[in-house]
Amino acid sequence: MLRSIRLRNLLSFGPDSEAFPLQALNVLIGPNASGKSNLIEALGLLRATPGDLLAPIREGGGASEWLWKGGTDGRTPTASLEVVLDYPEGGMPLRYRLAFSVSGQRLELVDEAIENEHVDDASASPDFFYRHHQGHPLLNVRTRMTDRPGSAKGRQTRPLPQASAEQSILSQRRDEDSYPELSYVGAWLGRVSLHREWNLGRYTPPRLPQRTDLPGDFLLEDASNLGLVLNDLMSRRGVKQTLLENLKRLYARVEDFSVRIQGGTLQVFFHEEGLSAPIPATRLSDGTLRYLCLLTLLCHPTPPPLVCIEEPELGLHPDVLPDIGRLLREASTRTQLIVTTHSDTLISSLSEVPESVVVCEQEQGGTVLRRLEKDKLSEWLSRYSLGEVWRMGELGGNRW
């Protein structure tokens, strides 16, 4: 699990942004332009570190467009991202830090480190496994396989003169024996699953016959492998029944769904009560298809370690939003979730777990995150739902 995240001089997060502790379920509320989506953008950047870091940088308008624009001294800021994540194989969590700036309109990495979160009793500083070291990268290579990962024992510090200045070390070193900590962080971040928007128009990938050579283990960001994921989930004990039970909460007449493979493509069909032939996904309403996508995420028995969803309430009838809240709580026992929402109905469904809600606001120094505290809300919640308290303006995260 991601224990904390700290963003500085990045997008709407200013230079004095503090490390923010994360829980299994984190539902962000706040007005438009407060920075909720920027947190997920930052996680998308981290996800790219074991692959091509420049891809999201380019898609976001170039390196300079990722930098905090609130400075008044005229200097080019240095953006930094720092996360602490659990490391079951080691003795303590790992801290990963990445910092970059702009040089001649190009991204320039100025710092990167992977180290233990805390110092141990015998050290003045945390054991490190990689450090950028002011442009002279150092790797702490494991030379004795008998020593536990996360330990400084049995290590040899080696320079890395040919490291790229535009790509993370996570994309350049992946030996699980020699660099177990780097391999673990890279694999973990690479599995982060982001779902920022689904295009569900008439001729979009989730509706049309889909390629059979796409991955089927988890839903892609554009939902282009929806049929393959459903086909995989159908083979898992009890999962199809769970999907159908939840789907009927919105689509009461549905009796079953099936997947057909024809001519090298795959398509999803729905069997509706009273109809003699199935209905293809091309004929489903946008809301029904969106809900089905959400179900594949939230009912999955073996999801990725972190799943991010932007505004799951879009296109759905308000009556089904309490079910989304229930599904979020259930899914958070299997994975970590970061979700954004503008729905007071969805927030009301979290009244029993108000500590899962994070208020996001834009202040003079940038985006500020603040988690609700259950004890401080007990009197309010004895009379109102959490969504009602939010709309009253007692939680923050309101426009006025």
Model-based region annotation:
Residues 1, 323-400:
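C-terminal lobe/lid and adjacent interdomain/linker elements of RecA-like ASCE P-loop ATPase modules
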Residues 90-245:
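Electropositive, glycine-dotted interaction segments
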Residues 72-74, 89, 299-302, 329-333, ...:
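Conserved catalytic network of the ASCE P-loop NTPase/AAA+ motor domain
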Residues 24-62, 112, 291-295, 340:
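Phosphate-binding glycine-rich loops of NTP-binding sites
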Residues 31, 225, 238, 245-299, ...:
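Conserved ABC ATPase signature
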Residues 40-108:
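Conserved P-loop NTP-binding catalytic core
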Residues 17-23, 299-302:
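Phosphate-binding P-loop
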Residues 1-16:
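N-terminal pre-Walker A segment at the start of P-loop NTPase domains
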